[in-house]
Curated annotation (Swiss-Prot):
Its EC number is 5.3.1.1. GO terms for molecular function: triose-phosphate isomerase activity. Keywords: Cytoplasm, Gluconeogenesis, Glycolysis, Isomerase. Substrate binds at N9, W10, K11, G173, S213, G234, G235. PROSITE patterns: TIM_1 (PS00171), TIM_2 (PS51440). This is Triosephosphate isomerase. Its main location: cytoplasm. Involved in the gluconeogenesis. Catalyzes stereospecifically the conversion of dihydroxyacetone phosphate (DHAP) to D-glyceraldehyde-3-phosphate (G3P). The active site is at H96 (electrophile), E167 (proton acceptor). GO terms for cellular component: cytosol. It comes from Phocaeicola vulgatus (strain ATCC 8482 / DSM 1447 / JCM 5826 / CCUG 4940 / NBRC 14291 / NCTC 11154). Homodimer. It is found in: Cytoplasm.
Length: 251
């Protein structure tokens, strides 16, 4: 059976000391009130080796926000999947809309990143989603289908290790909001694509997270949908009270 997951994406926020403090505070809150879902925090690279040992791995998984598409070598500024795994991190976000937009990550680059993450026993949280122009042109289905090419080259066994996150890029920071119905509609479509490629059992066991503007106030409604298995949380993951409010939507 697929897992319900709430994953926090800290993005480029929190210096090292602030990140350690946030991880400790979250760890204490969840130790006192155990979650009914898997909880993951994906932090900047510099936090990983410090945050991983201070959280209870039975309650909180730790991940990176990216990794390189190369194994090792003369790639100044890059951090490999092997390096991420060596910190004790278990997860890595790949294909986030910000990486696609600002760093021009292609289907081919992301395919390499996914393979290297899996080779180092990391669990990829693979992001897909359409921008405003694509949504207004009603092209969201073909956009996410094209983006899934980065992971649809995998064997069924390897694909089963992937967590998907749908980001309605058009609804993030634009003042427009995606309804719970819109979220369910596209999540169901994504699951149907997985079923067509890998069969119903694999599709039924794939967690698909919602990466829109998820808050404590709307999480319960979003997560009540049959094909929404949790959230990839940005801003609300930077405050324990907000992040825990979203986690508690599964109670």
């Amino acid at each position: 059976m697929r897992k319900n997951i709430v994953a926090g994406n800290w993005k480029m926020n929190k210096n090292l000391q602030e990140g350690i403090a946030l991880a400790k505070e979250l760890n204490e809150a969840l130790a006192a009130d155990k979650p009914n879902c898997d909880v993951v925090i994906c932090t900047p690279f510099i936090h990983l080796a410090s945050v991983t040992p201070i959280v209870d791995k039975a309650v909180i998984g730790v991940g990176a926000e990216n990794c390189a598409d190369k194994v090792s070598g003369a790639y100044t500024g890059e951090v490999s999947a092997e390096m991420v795994a060596s910190t004790g991190a278990e997860y890595v976000i790949l294909g986030h809309s910000e990486r696609r937009a600002y760093y021009h990550e292609t289907v081919e680059i992301l395919e390499e990143k996914v393979k290297l993450a899996l080779a180092n026993n990391l669990k990829p949280i693979f992001c897909i989603g359409e921008v405003l122009e694509e949504r207004e042109a009603n092209k969201q289905n073909e956009v996410v289908a094209a983006q899934l090419a980065s992971v649809f080259s995998l064997s069924a066994e390897d694909f089963s290790k992937i967590i998907l996150a749908y980001e309605p890029v058009w609804a993030i920071g634009t003042g427009k909001t995606a309804t719970a119905e819109q979220a369910q509609e596209i999540h169901a479509f994504i699951r149907s694509l997985i079923a067509d490629k890998y069969g119903k059992e694999v599709a039924d066991n794939t967690s698909i997270l919602y990466g829109g503007s998820c808050k404590p106030s709307n999480a319960k409604e979003l997560f009540a949908n049959p094909d929404v298995d949790g959230g990839l949380i940005g801003g609300a993951a930077l405050k324990v009270v907000d992040f825990k409010g979203i986690i508690d939507a599964f109670k």
